[in-house]
Amino acid sequence: MFQGFLDDTVQFLIDLKFHNNSTFFHENHDRYVESVQVPFYEMIEELAPQMKKIDPQMETRPYKCISRIHRDTRFSKDKSPYRDHHWFLFRRAGESRDKSLFYYFEFGPDRLSWGMGIWGENRELMDYFRKKMRANPESILQLLESIQLSEHCLIPSGSVFKRMEVPDEIPEELRRWYTAKELYVEKYKPAWKTAFSENIVKVVSDDFIALAPLYRLLRGYADEIHPKG
């Protein structure tokens, strides 16, 4: 059962940042498993039943959800072989990560965040979302208001088209959503110490449940664009 992240979860990731080489990692592999991998796996497993309720096709196997500790350095100036943080994603099984719709959680010595959104820029899906907003702005606004984002300290984030023309029928409250180039909703400045309590599972789960109507809306749009035969 997940009891919160450990002090050594953070200490190991700090040590790895300053000794980012295969010798250190291999010598401390058991410590990595015990202090980092196991707590992440336990948290994923506790969230999994709720994620299946949100979308029965959601991938919830921990080894499929968690980020790799090894970095892909092929196209990066930073050649450090290991990450100094971890994240996990819940998305539909078998879907490519790029442009996918997903829930996420991220934790490390200098970060704590979670939310839901689209990985990278998905112009096709966002254009379809804009089309739906133009057709029925009040319905979209009503759904977003029902989520009560501010009560959950959740905020829309991601880059926007600064020069995109917004039709008159789009209300002010939807303009941020309408002009989105990238779109995700994230927890606003969660208290870092929350990660060390078992209660974080409930906090994250409650936010994921709150975001379910938006996830299902966008999921439905994605399925309309690319129906499966």
Task: Mark where each language-model region is.
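Short histidine-centered catalytic/ligand-binding loop motif
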Residues: 29-36, 118, 129-133, 196-200
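Gly/Pro-rich turn-and-neighbor structural signature
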Residues: 33-78
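Aromatic- and glycine-enriched beta-alpha-beta binding-site module
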Residues: 74-134
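Charge-rich, low-complexity terminal tails
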Residues: 172-229
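Short, charged, low-complexity amphipathic alpha-helix
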Residues: 1-23, 195-198, 221-228
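Aromatic/basic-lined ligand-recognition segments
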Residues: 69, 87, 162-175
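Contiguous, amphipathic alpha-helical segments that mediate oligomerization or scaffolding
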Residues: 17-52, 206-228
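Compact, glycine/acidic-enriched structural inserts
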Residues: 109-169
